[in-house]
């Protein structure tokens, strides 16, 4: 096994020396061929273009070394699953002695290339219940955030593509927190377009969908909402690290809440339907800073547009007729 590994490394080294500055283009073409984005003929043409006529053999030697390495890795131990070989190994009576040399060559050939049973390398088929399938699934299928293991696997693949060897735990933790905060920003932008909210410190949004809404026809309502002192109630014995002046007293907080309730409207806001793709599309158009990368933003906007749907006039008419039939049927049942 070590011999084949050394042969592969030697073939790779010879190929890199023959390619010179074109080695990156060769590895890119090799990756495209592995991903089945280009055919074997196209890959050979590109390799011949990058190599000179005297160094084309290094390309073939490298591919043969890879195939030999793969065959050694997937092959079964010697003698296991092999078919019996009955021809050519034993000398037949009546033949001249001059055939002994051919017999020795055949023995070496048989020792190097032994026939194998094709079914010995086939994967055993085991029927699985679809409910018990534990294969990795995309987040769009599970409707859940990616786990730490899924993120780490994706980061390892990306690291290998960029020439890195490994991914640290600190990097995985940073990506996990980044995904959570990114989704929180998107949800905040969507909800802030649908519901009223308050602002603390000039930028922090909170109290989404509060039932206490200001009355626009009262002058005091605007003053009351602009003069809010936000913060938790004061503690009886504040700690040394806390500033008592920054927290309102309990009586002041109760008076402020009663004043806001008196200045609010007498009707509650109408209930809204669930969030749909139109709400997400509008929120991303208004809050462009949520997805700062233009490539990611454009790709997701295209996906959202492809999923947008609304009923046409014929579907609305059919829905109206269906509702009338249901109403008539319920009326007959009541009678």
UniProtKB/Swiss-Prot annotation:
Component of the STAGA transcription coactivator-HAT complex, at least composed of SUPT3H, GCN5L2, TAF5L, TAF6L, SUPT7L, TADA3L, TAD1L, TAF10, TAF12, TRRAP and TAF9. GO terms for cellular component: nucleus; SAGA complex. PANTHER family: TRANSCRIPTIONAL ADAPTER 1. The keyword Transferase does not apply. It holds the Pfam family SAGA-Tad1. The gene is Tada1. This is Transcriptional adapter 1. It is found in: Nucleus. The keyword Nucleus applies.
């Amino acid at each position: 096994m070590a011999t084949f590994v050394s042969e592969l490394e030697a073939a790779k080294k010879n190929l890199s020396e023959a390619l010179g500055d074109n080695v990156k283009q060769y590895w890119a073409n090799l990756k495209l061929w592995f991903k089945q984005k280009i055919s074997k003929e196209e890959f050979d043409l590109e390799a011949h273009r990058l190599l000179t006529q005297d160094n084309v053999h290094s390309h073939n030697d490298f591919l043969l070394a890879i195939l030999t390495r793969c065959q050694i890795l997937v092959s079964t131990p010697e003698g296991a699953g092999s078919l019996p070989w009955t021809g050519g190994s034993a000398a037949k009576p009546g033949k001249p002695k001059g055939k002994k040399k051919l017999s020795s060559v055949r023995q070496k050939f048989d020792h190097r290339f032994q026939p194998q049973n094709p079914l010995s390398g086939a994967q055993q088929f085991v029927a699985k219940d679809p409910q018990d399938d534990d294969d990795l699934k995309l987040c769009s299928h599970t409707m859940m955030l990616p786990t730490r293991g899924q993120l780490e696997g994706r980061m390892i693949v990306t690291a290998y593509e960029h020439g890195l060897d490994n991914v640290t735990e600190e990097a995985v933790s940073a990506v996990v927190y980044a995904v959570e905060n990114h989704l929180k920003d998107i949800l905040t932008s969507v909800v802030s377009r649908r519901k009223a909210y308050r602002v603390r410190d000039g930028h922090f949004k909170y109290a989404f969908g509060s039932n206490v809404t200001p009355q626009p026809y009262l002058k005091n309502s605007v003053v009351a909402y602009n003069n809010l002192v936000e913060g938790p109630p004061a503690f009886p014995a504040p700690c040394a690290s806390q500033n008592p002046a920054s927290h309102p007293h309990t009586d002041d907080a109760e008076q402020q809440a009663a004043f806001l309730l008196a200045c609010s409207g007498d009707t509650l806001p109408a209930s809204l339907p669930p969030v749909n793709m139109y709400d997400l599309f509008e929120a991303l158009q208004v809050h462009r800073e949520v997805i700062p990368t233009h490539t990611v933003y454009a790709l997701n906007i295209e996906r959202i547009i492809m999923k947008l749907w609304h009923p046409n006039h014929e579907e609305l008419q059919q829905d109206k007729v269906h509702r009338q039939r249901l109403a008539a049927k319920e009326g007959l049942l009541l009678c």
